[in-house]
């Protein structure tokens, strides 16, 4: 698979595991399937409309990354790094989001159907028209996060503070 960088460079992703690799400003236009990224830099990466399946993002810096309108399935985000990204309309079904912090993220129209969100903090997150059917928020905090939609999700030991 090739990924085009802003500087018109191309790299071929030959491995399935990457540690401490700088993908800042990268343009991910091809599907990502079965990759593990640990301590990688995705600052301002363009993942708009990306297809991400069966991947793990462990302690990656994703500030400013654009995942809007992406399809993200069976993917794990584990981090104590603060995310500030655009997830507008992203499809994040069946994902595991663990030990993460989302601040000032645009998650309007995001589809988190059947996703599991554990030990995660969402601050000032815009969840307008988000689809949370069967999503499970466990030991999480949602603060100043605005949601409009049906309450057909599960909150377990989770605080929702407006």
Task: Write out the residue ranges for each language-model feature.
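Tandem repeat scaffolds
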Residues: 2-162
């Amino acid at each position: 698979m090739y990924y085009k960088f802003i500087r018109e460079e191309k790299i071929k992703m030959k491995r399935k595991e990457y540690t401490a690799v700088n993908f800042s400003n990268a343009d991910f236009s091809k599907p990502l399937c079965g990759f593990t990224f640990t301590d990688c830099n995705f600052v301002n990466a363009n993942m708009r409309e990306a297809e991400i399946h069966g991947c793990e993002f462990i302690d990656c810096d994703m500030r400013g990354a654009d995942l809007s309108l992406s399809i993200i399935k069976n993917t794990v985000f584990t981090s104590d790094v603060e995310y500030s990204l655009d997830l507008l309309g992203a499809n994040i079904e069946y994902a595991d989001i663990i030990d993460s912090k989302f601040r000032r993220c645009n998650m309007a129209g995001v589809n988190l159907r059947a996703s599991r969100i554990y030990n995660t903090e969402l601050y000032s997150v815009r969840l307008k028209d988000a689809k949370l059917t069967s999503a499970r928020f466990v030991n999480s905090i949602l603060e100043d996060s605005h949601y409009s939609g049906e309450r057909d999700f599960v909150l377990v030991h989770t605080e929702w503070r407006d």
